[in-house]
Amino acid sequence: MKVELRDKERIDDLQRNGYQIIQNPEKFCFGMDAVLLTGFAHARERDTMLDLGTGTGIIPLLMEAKYHCSHLTGLEIQEESADMARRSVALNDLQDRIDIVTGDIKEADRIFPAASFDCITCNPPYMIGQHGLTNPEEPKAIARHEVLCTLEDVVSRTAKLLKPGGHFYMVHRPFRLAEIMTMLVKYKLEPKRMQLVYPYIDKEPNMVLIEAVRGGRSRMTVEKPLIVYQAPGVYMPEIYDIYGY
């Protein structure tokens, strides 16, 4: 379907099923963290999926391309991003499979029925508070800093919206790992799988991928490290596979 592009917007190829996404590089474009999260997550065709803080809809689009879930929903508080996500859904003729809802993560348990999703994903803001921000209302700031929602907001609403035995997938920063694990256990989302992401084999990890299960038993698997680059500008083979190149 043809869709209207606003000022400064562009269409990018997602390398999956011929899907494309509308983005505005002056506002916010999806990053590698969102793509790696969809490579780490799993879903079944019968699953219903929710992406919290969906931005321009990258995670629902890639999850639909990979797993063909029965229905996917993206929740986004910024209307401009939600509008781009809706137009990307229309661009790929996926209106019957993906819904984009404008709303606040803190209100998610009022927007959606309790225990209504098999799978929830989230690429939340990583940085605590507004330290160093010149404009906390700027779209990139909202996406990266806990201006409008906190880690606890994400985890507590996920616990209410997941079905018993449902799976939660999140990408975050390793420096907050202790807090993340404490928060998941507090809300009875049992950590089941974790993978650290390293930019290079000799560098410290800069991302962590986590899977938790609502009401799951206490047993966690730590997967082998995921290395992004083998040389500057050259991805490792696993990264090419995740991107679909």
List PLM regions with ranges.
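Class I SAM-dependent transferase core
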Residues: K2-E45
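Short, structurally constrained coil/turn elements
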Residues: Q15, A43, L94, V185-K188
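General small-molecule cofactor/ligand-binding pocket signal
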Residues: I22, D99-V101, K192-Q195
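Conserved SAM/SAH cofactor-binding pocket of Class I
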Residues: F40-L133, S156
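A generic structural micro-feature
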Residues: K66-Y67, P113-A114, D202-N206, M220
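Mobile active-site "lid"/loop adjacent to the S-adenosyl-L-methionine
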Residues: P124-D153
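Conserved Class I SAM-dependent methyltransferase catalytic core
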Residues: L148-P199, K203-P205
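SAM/dcSAM-binding transferase cores
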Residues: E204-Y245
